Amino acid sequence: TYHAWDGLDKETLENDRKYNPNGAIEDDNGNVIGFYDNQIDYYRQTHYQLLLNQILSPSWKLNIALHYTDGYGYYEEYKNKRTLVEYGLVPFETNGTTIEKSDLVRRKLVDSRFGGGVFSFDYKGDKLDASIGGGLNYYKNTHNGKVVWVKNYLGELNPDHEYYRNIGRKTDGNIYAKINYEILDGVNFYADMQYRYLRYKINGNNDKWDWTADPAHLQPLNIDEDFSFFNPKAGIFWKINNNNNLYASFSVANKEPTRNNYTDNLFAAQPKSERMFDYEVGYTFRKGWFNAGVNLYYMDYKNQLVLNG
């Protein structure tokens, strides 16, 4: 599909809201003289799954799932007046003038592999429901960028000139147990516990140029981090009658930094994992067609990973 993901300034939005700046080709004065036809993004995934659901007895059930996903994609774009050294290209001379910037076409690619499995044993009794389970997943992706074409370039340019490459790997495993027990008629206690371990490894070069380095170069990626998380949750639910319910809960949630938290944060301290304590209490009312409820909560974050942009 053709790119359409850049925003518009207020003036353009008011006067020409259908204008799409993606793929614009500019002359030396910055005037748009055309658009690049192959300003596209492409991605495909192939999914494989193997599922087993086995009823072992009236009370016990076994679930197993294996999965594998193969993915590949890229986006190609025309870039105006780009600094050549940022793409591993040597400035060139023409008519006695050194050319350090030129228009070019670049292609950024990703090749990914994701596989793993999950399982659970589920028990259902008169007053007790319980489950134990877990999962293990492995993800590997290769990011790289190529220069497809450079305007009026007089230096050496190999076909599909590669200017960055990095390989990321993530291993993610967990085990858990959870119960729901009817303490009294209409009063249920529920709890679950999860232990999760994961490891990140990213090696290679990022696609961002570090002008603060001496000499300047592509930002290196050398990340090897592991995390261990314990995520418990407990609560109580009280069905007062057919119309009124009360509930309260406490939970702990931990979250690892994402790939972008690492690659976009190379000039600052390494990102840390996020931890949240969640306290909730609520009430619901239901009668006929009418439903109403109130939920009070307090989330206590440490090292919150906040989205920006």
PLM segments and residue spans:
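Flexible, surface-exposed loop regions and adjacent strand-edge segments
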Residues: 2-19, 78-89, 143-156, 205-216, ...
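Acidic/polar loop-and-plug regions of large Gram-negative outer-membrane beta-barrel proteins
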Residues: 1-49, 77-104
